[in-house]
């Protein structure tokens, strides 16, 4: 016999409305109650009646996608693959921006609950706490940042920097400057910065690290500081910062080899000495949808996948 919300409520000794709120990720439900009800739902493999979806006017599943910035070259590559995979499954995307603001994520979550979306793909960032993220546990995948017991797709930041540094070192460079991101950013900033410094230390070459915000303008403004020391090559934490470096070098009639994480077709057209690394952005998008569909299919998972990197 097919289980109903009433059956779940009886087994948990709560009201039907409480079960409904858990299914809709209502933040007003206490953590203890949510976990108790979710445990019964997972154990019994309960799935809500799909007729409820039709009553709300949605013939197809809806997935909310929260990117940090729609103008991000990196995230747009991941988003493009996410959309391709969702369209293939007849799933409707609802795309919003967080702009690195936890408050906006909370507002978007409220919107998703109002729209009764089926699942969420969230591009994480350092300021976003686990407390906020776990509101959608059970129908959520994070991208770029991993959280405990939450399905996630994350990047191999440390190995990416180490791979590029190794290649530049093999080419004979010993004064490799690094245009990085503020350490408060755990992935693009902290992890990549630490990897650069560790390589310099292990290979006994001088470190020249300058931090910028993750924008072209900020990177450009930090370039004079980076160039105060001898530089034979410049490694950048992102393709946008590589554009900053290229702009500065061209304006000052300097020609130095550049390297960066990620691929930017326009940048590659103008930077002849560019070494890039395929960070696996499309693969991340494909895997994110896979993990979300697993959950929407009624299965519980906390799988976290690290995307491999490859020199272009």
Placement of each model-derived feature along the sequence:
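Short beta-strand segments enriched in small/hydrophobic residues
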Residues: 18-21, 55-71, 175-182
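Short beta->alpha junction loops
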Residues: 95-102, 207-217
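Hydrophobic alpha-helical segments within soluble ligand-binding/sensing domains
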Residues: 153-178, 217-224, 242, 279-297
């Amino acid at each position: 016999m097919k289980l109903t919300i009433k059956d779940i409520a009886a087994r948990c000794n709560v009201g039907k409305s409480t079960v409904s709120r858990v299914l809709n990720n209502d933040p007003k439900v206490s953590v203890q109650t949510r976990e108790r009800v979710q445990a019964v739902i997972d154990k019994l493999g309960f799935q809500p009646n799909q007729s409820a979806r039709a009553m709300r006017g949605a013939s197809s599943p809806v997935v909310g996608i929260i990117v940090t910035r729609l103008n991000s070259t990196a995230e747009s590559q991941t988003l493009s693959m996410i959309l391709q995979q969702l369209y293939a499954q007849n799933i409707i995307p609802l795309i919003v921006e967080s702009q690195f603001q936890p408050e906006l994520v909370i507002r978007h979550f409220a919107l998703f609950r109002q729209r009764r979306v089926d699942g969420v793909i969230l591009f994480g960032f350092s300021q976003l706490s686990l407390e906020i993220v776990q509101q959608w546990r059970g129908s959520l995948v994070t991208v770029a940042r991993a959280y405990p017991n939450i399905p996630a797709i994350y990047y191999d930041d440390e190995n990416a920097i180490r791979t590029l540094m190794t290649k530049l070192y093999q080419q004979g460079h010993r004064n490799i400057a690094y245009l990085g991101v503020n350490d408060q950013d755990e992935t693009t900033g902290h992890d990549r910065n630490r990897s650069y410094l560790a390589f310099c230390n292990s290979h006994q070459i001088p470190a020249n690290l300058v931090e910028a915000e993750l924008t072209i303008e900020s990177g450009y403004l930090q370039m004079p500081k980076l160039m105060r020391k001898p530089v034979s090559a410049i490694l950048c934490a992102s393709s946008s910062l590589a554009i900053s470096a290229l702009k500065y070098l061209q304006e000052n009639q300097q020609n130095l080899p550049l390297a960066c994480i990620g691929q930017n077709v326009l940048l590659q057209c103008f930077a002849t000495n560019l070494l890039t690394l395929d960070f696996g952005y499309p693969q991340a998008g494909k895997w994110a949808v896979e993990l979300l569909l697993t959950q929407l299919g009624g299965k519980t998972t906390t799988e976290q996948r690290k995307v491999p990197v490859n020199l272009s």
